[in-house]
C-alpha cells in the first residue's frame, strides 16, 4: 500500500488500517462508510457495489468504494456471512467544528462470532468458541454475545473438541495456542471456521470461576479478552461462566445428531423434517432457542426429566388455560436480544416499547400459571418477575409513536418532563403566532397571495410575487431574490423564529438526554431481564411440548432403574408427521434386561433404518422431557447414543465409505457403556463380503462380551443370524414380508426370528430395472439356490436366434449388458449391487 504524498485524511486511513489488517475497514466520511485500496476492490466484487477512485487524475488513483451509513448493516451482514471481519471507524467529532482532520477511531470490530446487530433477526444462537491447550488437556469456552450465555468445559482430545464445535454450529474459533498443521487443516479447511488468535487474558475475573482447571480458566479469560478487544465497551449483559461436563447430558456426536435429523434434516439442511420441526410450537424467540438447546443436550438426571414431564402433564390437563397462555406468549419479544442492545448502547425507542409490551404481558402469564393451582409450577412462577417499576418508567416516558432514530425528536411522552413540555409549548404557540402574523400582514398590505414559508437556508419568510412588489410594506426587509418572486422578513417574524429555533434545539437536546438517562436506567435491570427471559423461555418450551403431545397423540414415557426397553406400538414421530398417521405402521420394540443386541435382517427399503431411528428418536424425546409416540413406553435412561446409519436409504448420495464406517464403529465401541444405545446399520458393506462379515461378527461379539450396551444391528449378512445360538444376550428379529401370486409386499413390521430371504431382485424391480434383465436375474438365482453354490453359473452361449434379450446375450449390442457382464456380483455386498443398479437405471 503506497503511502507517499497522501492527504491527511488518507494518511489517517492508512494508519488505522495497519492496526486491523485482517478486516475490512469501513471508514466514516460524512454520510458514507468508505473503503480504499484492496478493501475497496474486494468489497466492490463481494457486495456488488461501484468501484471508483480517489484523485482520479493522479498517476496512481486510489481505488475507492462506499456504502451509505444508514444502510451499512445489510452490507456488513454480507461480509460477515462470507466469513470476513469488519472494523468500523467512526467520526469522533463534528466535522464542522473539527480543526484539521476529523478525529476517527475504530469503535467496533464485527466478526462471524460477534454479530449482535444483524439486519436479519434470527432465533438461533451464534456461539463464539475459544480453545486453549495444556499438555493433553483442552479447555473449550463458548458464549453467545447476544444472549450473554457463557460456558466452559474440559476435554481430553482434539476429536472431542471438534465434535463440540460442530454441535455448537460455531463459525469462529478463538485460539489461545498455536495449532499444529493437522489441527489447522481440520478447523480451517474441513470445518470452514474463521480462526482468530488471542494470547492475552482478561484481567477482570468477576465473570470467571476461580475453581476452574487452569486450561479452562485460560480458555474462558482469552475468550473474554477477545470479546472486549473487538467490542470496545462494557458488556454488562454477559453472564458468569457456567462449567459443564459433556457426560452430564445424553452424549451424541455430530454424526449421530445428523443421522437422526435432530435439529435439521440431513438431506435438505432445513428445519422441516427434523425433530426440532416436530416439537417447535414455541411462541417466543427465547423459547425456540431453548428448545433447540434441549434437543442438543437431553438430560440423564431422572429427577429433572420427571420435573419437565410433570409440567407438560399440567398443561395437557388445562387446555383452556394453556390456550390463554400461548396467546399471552405471542406478545413477548426477544428479551435477551433487547437486553444485549441495552448493553451495547444500541437501544432505540422501538426496543424500549417492545420491552414495555413484554413486561406488561408477564403479570397475565403469571396469573394463568397461578390459576392452575399446581405446586409443580411453583419454580416457573418464581422466575416470572414482571419488573413493574421498569414497565411503568418506559410506558410513562416513551411516546407510543416514537421514531426509531433517537435524534429526530418526538420520543418522550408529553407530561413526562416539565421543561420539555415548555419547549414544546413554545413550538406549538410559535406556529399559531406565525399563522396570526401571516393573516395580519396579508390584510394590512392588501396582498391576497401573501404567505409565510420556511426553508433551512432562509428560515421563515414572506413570499411575494413580482407583480405584488409595489405593495410590500416598508417594515419588510429583503431576504432573497428569485426569478419570479422575492422573500422578505420582519423583526416580529425573526423574533418568533428565533424563539422557535431555540426551543426546537433545546427540545431535541433535552429529549436525547432524557432518552439516554432512561436507557442507562434500563441497563440496571439487565440481570433481572435475563432471568425473566429464561423463565419465559422454559414456560414456552414446556407448553410447546404439551401442544405437540396433544396434536401428535404422544404419551408420557416411564423410566426404570433396569435396562429393559418396552415400547408398545411405537412410531417415528417425524416420519409419521410427514407421511400422515393413517399410512404409518407402528412397531413394538422390546428388549428384556438380559437382551443387549437385536440382530435385524430383512430386505432393503423395508423399514429397518426407520425402526432403528425410531428407538433413538424416542429416547431423545423422552430424555429432553417430551412425551413420545407410542401406546406405552418403558425406557432406561441412556448415557449416550452412537449410530452408524449411513445412506442405506439414500443411495445416490454415495457419501459413506468403509473408513468412515470403521471410524464411527470404533468411536462407539471405545466410548459406549452398558447404559448406552448403539445403532449399526449394514456395518461392513463397504468392503469384500467375507471381510465385512468377519468384522460385523467380531463387532457384535465385542459389544456382547465387553460392553453390554443396548444395540440394534441391522445386517444383510444372513449368516450372522446363527449367532443367536452362541450369544445368549442376542436375539434375531426381521422385517415381515407377504408373498402372494408372485408379488412381494413389505409389511414394515418387525417380528421375531431371522429373515428367510433378502428379496434383492424385488428391490431391483421397485427401482425400475428392465423386465428382461430381472427375469434373467431370477433364473440365475433359482439356479444358484438349486446348486447351493457360491460361484456364479457359467454364462449361456449366445444363440443366433433369440426371442428375448437375456442378461448376457448380445452384449455388444447393449452397453449396459456389457457393464453387467463385468460385475463380480458374488463378491459384492447388496449395497454395492444396489448402487450399481441405480447408476445403470439412470443410463436407460
Swiss-Prot record:
A Pfam family reported for this protein in Swiss-Prot or TrEMBL: MutS_III
Alphabetized UniProt keyword annotations: ATP-binding, DNA damage, DNA repair, DNA-binding, Nucleotide-binding
GO BP field: mismatch repair
Binding sites annotated in the UniProt record for ATP: 602-609
GO CC terms, sorted: cytosol
SMART domains tied to this protein: MUTSac, MUTSd
Superkingdom of origin organism: Bacteria
An MF annotation (GO) of this entry: ATP-dependent DNA damage sensor activity
PANTHER family in UniProt: DNA MISMATCH REPAIR PROTEIN MSH1, MITOCHONDRIAL, DNA MISMATCH REPAIR PROTEIN MUTS FAMILY MEMBER
Cited function: This protein is involved in the repair of mismatches in DNA. It is possible that it carries out the mismatch recognition step. This protein has a weak ATPase activity.
Family per similarity comment: Belongs to the DNA mismatch repair MutS family.
Protein's UniProt name: DNA mismatch repair protein MutS
Organism: Streptococcus pneumoniae (strain Taiwan19F-14)
Gene of this entry: mutS
Amino acid at each position: 500500500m503506497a503511502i507517499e504524498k497522501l492527504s491527511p485524511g488518507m494518511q489517517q486511513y492508512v494508519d488505522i488500517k495497519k492496526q486491523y489488517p485482517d478486516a475490512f475497514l469501513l471508514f466514516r466520511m460524512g454520510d458514507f462508510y468508505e473503503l480504499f485500496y484492496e478493501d475497496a476492490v474486494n468489497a466492490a466484487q463481494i457486495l456488488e457495489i461501484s468501484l471508483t477512485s480517489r484523485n482520479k487524475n493522479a498517476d496512481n488513483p486510489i481505488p475507492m468504494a462506499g456504502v451509505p451509513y444508514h444502510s451499512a448493516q445489510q452490507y456488513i451482514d454480507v461480509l460477515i456471512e462470507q466469513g470476513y471481519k469488519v472494523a468500523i471507524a467512526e467520526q469522533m467529532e463534528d466535522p464542522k467544528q473539527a480543526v484539521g482532520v476529523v478525529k476517527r477511531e475504530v469503535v467496533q470490530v464485527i466478526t462471524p462470532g460477534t454479530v449482535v446487530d444483524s439486519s436479519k433477526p434470527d432465533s438461533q444462537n451464534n456461539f463464539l468458541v475459544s480453545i486453549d491447550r495444556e499438555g493433553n488437556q483442552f479447555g473449550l469456552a463458548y458464549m453467545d454475545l447476544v444472549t450473554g450465555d457463557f460456558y466452559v468445559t474440559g476435554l481430553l482430545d482434539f476429536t472431542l473438541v471438534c465434535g463440540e464445535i460442530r454441535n455448537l454450529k460455531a463459525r469462529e474459533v478463538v485460539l489461545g495456542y498455536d495449532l499444529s498443521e493437522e489441527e489447522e487443516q481440520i478447523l480451517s479447511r474441513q470445518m470452514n471456521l474463521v480462526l482468530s488468535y488471542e494470547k492475552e487474558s482478561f484481567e477482570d475475573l468477576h465473570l470467571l470461576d476461580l475453581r476452574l482447571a487452569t486450561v479452562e480458566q485460560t480458555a474462558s479469560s482469552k475468550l473474554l479478552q477477545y470479546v472486549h478487544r473487538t467490542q470496545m465497551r462494557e458488556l454488562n449483559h454477559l453472564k458468569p461462566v457456567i462449567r459443564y461436563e459433556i457426560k452430564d447430558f445424553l452424549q451424541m456426536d455430530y454424526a449421530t445428531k445428523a443421522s437422526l435429523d435432530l435439529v435439521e434434516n440431513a438431506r435438505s439442511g432445513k428445519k422441516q423434517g427434523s425433530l426440532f420441526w416436530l416439537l417447535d410450537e414455541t411462541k417466543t424467540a427465547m423459547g425456540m432457542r431453548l428448545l433447540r438447546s434441549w434437543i442438543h443436550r437431553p438430560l440423564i438426571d431422572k429427577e429433572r426429566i420427571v420435573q419437565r414431564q410433570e409440567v407438560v402433564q399440567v398443561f395437557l390437563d388445562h387446555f383452556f388455560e394453556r390456550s390463554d397462555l400461548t396467546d399471552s406468549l405471542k406478545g413477548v419479544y426477544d428479551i435477551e436480544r433487547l437486553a444485549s442492545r441495552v448493553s451495547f448502547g444500541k437501544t432505540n425507542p422501538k426496543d424500549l416499547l417492545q420491552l414495555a409490551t413484554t413486561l406488561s404481558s408477564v403479570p397475565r402469564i403469571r396469573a394463568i400459571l397461578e390459576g392452575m393451582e399446581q405446586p409443580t409450577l411453583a419454580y416457573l412462577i418464581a422466575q416470572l418477575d414482571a419488573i413493574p417499576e421498569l414497565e411503568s418508567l418506559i410506558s410513562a416516558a416513551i411516546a407510543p409513536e416514537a421514531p426509531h432514530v433517537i435524534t429526530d425528536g418526538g420520543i418522550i411522552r408529553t407530561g413526562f418532563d416539565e421543561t420539555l413540555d415548555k419547549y414544546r409549548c413554545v413550538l406549538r404557540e410559535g406556529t399559531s403566532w406565525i399563522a396570526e402574523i401571516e393573516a395580519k400582514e396579508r390584510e394590512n398590505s392588501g396582498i391576497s397571495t401573501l404567505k409565510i414559508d420556511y426553508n433551512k437556508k432562509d428560515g421563515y419568510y414572506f413570499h411575494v410575487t413580482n407583480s405584488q412588489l409595489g405593495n410590500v410594506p416598508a417594515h419588510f426587509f429583503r431576504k432573497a431574490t428569485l426569478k419570479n418572486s422575492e422573500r422578505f422578513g420582519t423583526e416580529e417574524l425573526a423574533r418568533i423564529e428565533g424563539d422557535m429555533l431555540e426551543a426546537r434545539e433545546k427540545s431535541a437536546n433535552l429529549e436525547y438526554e432524557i432518552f439516554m438517562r432512561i436507557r442507562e436506567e434500563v441497563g440496571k435491570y439487565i440481570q433481572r431481564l435475563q432471568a425473566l427471559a429464561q423463565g419465559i423461555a422454559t414456560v414456552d418450551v414446556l407448553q410447546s411440548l404439551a401442544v405437540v403431545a396433544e396434536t401428535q397423540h404422544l404419551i408420557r414415557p416411564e423410566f426404570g432403574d433396569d435396562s429393559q426397553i418396552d415400547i408398545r406400538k411405537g412410531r417415528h414421530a417425524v416420519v409419521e408427521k410427514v407421511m400422515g398417521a393413517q399410512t404409518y405402521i407402528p412397531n413394538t420394540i422390546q428388549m428384556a434386561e438380559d437382551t443387549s443386541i437385536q440382530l435385524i435382517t430383512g430386505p432393503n427399503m423395508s423399514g429397518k433404518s426407520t425402526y432403528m431411528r425410531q428407538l433413538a428418536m424416542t429416547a431423545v424425546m423422552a430424555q429432553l422431557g417430551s412425551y413420545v409416540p407410542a401406546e406405552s413406553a418403558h425406557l432406561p435412561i441412556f448415557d449416550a447414543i452412537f449410530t452408524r446409519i449411513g445412506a442405506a436409504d439414500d443411495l445416490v448420495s454415495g457419501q459413506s465409505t468403509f473408513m468412515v464406517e470403521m471410524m464411527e464403529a470404533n468411536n462407539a465401541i471405545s466410548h459406549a457403556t452398558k447404559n448406552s444405545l448403539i445403532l449399526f446399520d449394514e456395518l461392513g458393506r463397504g468392503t469384500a463380503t467375507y471381510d465385512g462379515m468377519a468384522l460385523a461378527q467380531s463387532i457384535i461379539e465385542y459389544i456382547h462380551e465387553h460392553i453390554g450396551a443396548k444395540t440394534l444391528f441391522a445386517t444383510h449378512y444372513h449368516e450372522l443370524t446363527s449367532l443367536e445360538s452362541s450369544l445368549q444376550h442376542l436375539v434375531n428379529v426381521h422385517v415381515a414380508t407377504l408373498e402372494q401370486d408372485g408379488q412381494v409386499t413389505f409389511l414394515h413390521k418387525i417380528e421375531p426370528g431371522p429373515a428367510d430371504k433378502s428379496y434383492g431382485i424385488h428391490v431391483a424391480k421397485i427401482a425400475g430395472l428392465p423386465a428382461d434383465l430381472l427375469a434373467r436375474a431370477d433364473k440365475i438365482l433359482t439356479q444358484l439356490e438349486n446348486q447351493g453354490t457360491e460361484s456364479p453359473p457359467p454364462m449361456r452361449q449366445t444363440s443366433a436366434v433369440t426371442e428375448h434379450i437375456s442378461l448376457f446375450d448380445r452384449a455388444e449390442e447393449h452397453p449396459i449388458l456389457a457393464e453387467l457382464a463385468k460385475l463380480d456380483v458374488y463378491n459384492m455386498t447388496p449395497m454395492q449391487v444396489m448402487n450399481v443398479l441405480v447408476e445403470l437405471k439412470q443410463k436407460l
